[in-house]
């Protein structure tokens, strides 16, 4: 496990939950995750769930993704998706408004791995270097991803070579995020 990334993720999650508490006097609320089982759910309303992060349960690796492509993934991406279960969190990085993706449950973790495999299949077909997404942006063709070769975090336009380095590492990227409610 990449402890720097794990700590940076936990720290951002704490900042996010603290900001939510300060503004709403509750744990984060999600309508999108209503009806989706998770150990994070602490209460339910008629159309939303209140959640709090929980420790990740299960194998702490993305072995299915590695096996599918016979590659070794950056330790930071393994840590990012296996440190905790949590809801997706909105954030600001410099001028970028984003949604930081998280795994919500063990079932969601399997879905995330399938989506990462699909992303890598497309990149391989287009002869692009491998990246693994960690956040979405307002423009659905752009994502924030981790370059599996360099470990840098970049903004990329899906299906193209357009990439802009945002941070030298995932830990540094997470440290610079500001919660957005």
UniProtKB/Swiss-Prot annotation:
It is a peripheral membrane protein. One of its GO terms (cellular component) is cytoplasmic side of plasma membrane. It is found in: Cell inner membrane. Its main location: membrane. Keywords: Cell inner membrane, Cell membrane, Membrane. Belongs to the Syd family. Interacts with the SecY protein in vivo. May bind preferentially to an uncomplexed state of SecY, thus functioning either as a chelating agent for excess SecY in the cell or as a regulatory factor that negatively controls the translocase function. This is Protein Syd. It comes from Escherichia fergusonii (strain ATCC 35469 / DSM 13698 / CCUG 18766 / IAM 14443 / JCM 21226 / LMG 7866 / NBRC 102419 / NCTC 12128 / CDC 0568-73). The lineage of its organism: Bacteria, Pseudomonadati, Pseudomonadota, Gammaproteobacteria, Enterobacterales.
